[in-house]
Amino acid sequence: MSGGFISRGFFGKRRPPEGMEGRLPPGQYYESGFPVLTVGPTEKIETDAWTLRVDGLVEHAVEWNWNSFQALPRTTYEGDIHCVTKWSKLGTNFSGVSVDELLKLAQPQPEAKYVLATSFGGYTTNVPLADLVDGKAWVADTHEGQPLPREHGGPARLLVPHLYFWKSAKWVTKLTLLAEDEWGFWERNGYHHRGDPWKEQRYTGD
């Protein structure tokens, strides 16, 4: 993964629309747009070169190409997302395949407790397995009814909306199930190992 940090598109408002005040976690402000934050260059992955693999502590390592991924059952998330840089986007939606659906095919082994997500380009982030199951996470390929743009992780990204958004790895290509927690890029660089916005778990020690 190349160095550098890219961000753009901040149009934040400190106060959310009326009736949405309780949806902002502590320390967050309302953002009407969808800012772009990226470590390194924006990846360009054509759908005919895209793959997603689930491996590690599973009974069956499974890999999908774009066509086989598109054939899986799909669901939609409607709700909010929260970035560790303190913006929150309220009332948005993404569609894709739930992680539950992927794991149903891979069959996690009993000792699997954590997942390391790997992106095209080498970015990694760690997530407790419990934060990816029971309808809490997706591999999403559309946003607001349109194909997910490259700058937001298209053709597909991990979506874990109840955690800070760096856990929702852009351009995801692999989910590896592990018995022990293995920190990813930002976690090795001082960010919290879990990242719950309602507990303000931004940095190590929070």
Q: Which ranges hold each PLM region?
A:
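Structured, non-membrane catalytic/scaffold regions adjacent to prosthetic-group chemistry
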Residues: 2-206
